[in-house]
Amino acid sequence: MSMKNPPHPGGVIARQVIEPLGLSVTDAAGILGVTRQALSLLLNERTDLSSGMALRIEKAFGPKMDHLMRMQLAFDLARQRQREGRIRVKRYSGQAKIEEPQPA
C-alpha cells in the first residue's frame, strides 16, 4: 500500500540522522565529502536525493541506500500523482498510424 503523502527523504535524514548526532550541516557535509550547499538543499527538501548522496549517507551514518532511495521513489510517485490532472495525454487505442520519420 502506498502512502498518499510520503515524506521527503531530506527531511527524514535531517531529523533522524543529522540532528540526533548533533552535527551542523557544515560538519555533516564535510563528513560526506559534499558541499554545505548541496547537503543543505537536500535537508531542506529543495532537491531530490541522488543515489550518490544516498550511498555517502549509508557509508557515513548507516541508513541503507536502498531504503533511502525507496523513500525518494515514493515521494516522487506521490508528487506526480498529485500533478497528473495537469498532464494532457490521450489514451492510445491502437488505431492511429504512426508516421516514420523521413530521412533528411
Which role fits each region the language model picked out?
Residues 33, 44-46, 73:
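Residue-level detection of the helix-turn-helix DNA-binding "recognition helix"
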Residues 22-41:
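Short alpha-helical DNA-recognition segment
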Residues 1-23, 70:
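A short, Lys/Arg-rich alpha-helix, primarily the initiator
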Residues 46-59:
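Short, basic-rich loop-to-helix N-cap that marks the start of a DNA-contacting helix
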Residues 69-104:
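Short, charged recognition helix plus adjacent turn
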Residues 59-73:
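K/E-rich alpha-helical interaction surfaces of small helical-bundle regulatory domains
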Residues 41, 55, 70:
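DNA-binding alpha-helical recognition surfaces that contact promoter or target DNA
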